[in-house]
Amino acid sequence: MATMTSREFNQDLARAKRVARQEPVVVTDRGEPSHVLMSY
């Protein structure tokens, strides 16, 4: 599972979507997991 901070997610949504095609992306907020992005 890939991980990215909420700041990275907000600054590069295209990259997050690209990675999510291959594996779930955990988005963290202040170091704690808060959301998971997955492709459909």
Question: What is the predicted function of each stretch?
Answer:
Residues 26, 33-40:
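Short beta->alpha transition motifs characteristic of CBS
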Residues 4-21:
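The conserved cystathionine-beta-synthase
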Residues 5, 26-28:
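Residues that mark the N-terminal boundary/hinge immediately upstream of a DNA-recognition element
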